């Protein structure tokens, strides 16, 4: 919201983020000195992707209607202003142009509708926000080419309903109704969506690398198509002191549990590989880092041999996934020549 809040539309899936985002009378959202701030709405748990897509389609249709109205009054406007309104401009420059438009058409007969809706000419930033429980089945929206930004707050479980397993739950984690530990690897949503080829995809962790987080958000918003940001999100269901969450996030990235990357299809147009891998190969011991969290310690206390084997399997899986990302990014080790 600090980057785009004055022109931001948020479709928020039901879950933890909708509780702290819309639980009146308090709200984390505010307005700036000009009275502009995010427009927020909450959808049902399952359909937030379609709900947010509707935002984008509505904004685009609204803008097209205003552009048609603008063409009807082209002869009433200075030629330079009319040309500027038909070319790309920053939000700040566009707002200035809209102010000039209103000044030029004030008092002109029949221009009332255009004057009322002229703010539609300022590009809106549409964001679909929700947890992994909702978001790991949203490719029906990403398969399209609409300009929506999707932020997945990935807690690796259904946090708002007590911590049940989701497709994002990692191998070996104990969850509610899953006391024997997850026995298969989590779905790799990011890599799956890269395969479309037209989707901007980033995996971020605020505590692991702040600059990469901000850069990914800026690139996603600037990308003229669908974008997906998967953000590691600490949760009380993980079972550790969240005051230490940034330290844990750094360790999880160092072990390869949460690699950082940005997949930007525009890079291919520049003759570059689309994927930029922003974290190093796994180095820290995985088991030691996982033992910081109760969701992994519980299985170790109940079935230590099973836990040890699952952690070995998890480490091998994470290394394999990192190696695959490294190949996509052109960072794979070259075989020695004979």
Ranges and model annotations:
Residues 2, 61-64, 96-97, 103, ...:
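Residue-identity detector for glutamine
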Residues 1-150, 157-158, 163-172, 179-184, ...:
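Cofactor-binding active-site loop characterized by glycine-rich and histidine/acidic residues
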Residues 10, 14, 227, 305:
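P-loop NTPase catalytic cores that bind/hydrolyze ATP
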Residues 107-109, 113-114, 120-149, 153-280:
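Glycine-rich ThDP/TPP pyrophosphate-binding loop and its adjacent helix/strand module
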